[in-house]
Amino acid sequence: MQHTVTLDENEIMLARTIASLRTGNNRVAGTSHNVQIPGQDNFRNDLLGICGEIVFAKTYNIYLDLCFHIRSGGPDFKLGNKTIDVKTTHHANGRLIVPLAKKNKPSDRYVLITGDLPTFTIRGFATSDEVFSSQGDVGHGSCFVINQENLHAFKF
């Protein structure tokens, strides 16, 4: 089962603020995104990412990590005894794409959220074993990739 969430204007303002701070700090520190796609804007990627995190936190009534300091990956959430890494794309039919480097600091679950401001849909999740046995290339270098139809449904 999929779940759709529409962010309100305060949540969108929070997302824009955190995305701006994360993008600026990364630029100052000289760090880059794990997946570089020609022509993509780092701020837009950060904005979609934090929106996905807000959607997940709002859905599960858990605290959102509001930090904007430089992070080297790792999970976005802990839900029960499972670590969760949220991946967000604006493509409605998008796939769960996980950079190769995530294998060094794996999360227990990888969640795919699709959408664009203000409405997003939680599509499902894959386990770390499923993710790390799904190496492929979506046209921008090697990564782990799982199609939506192969994701597990959440119970809401």
Task: Name what the model sees in each region.
Residues 1-80, 87-156:
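Nucleic-acid endonuclease domains
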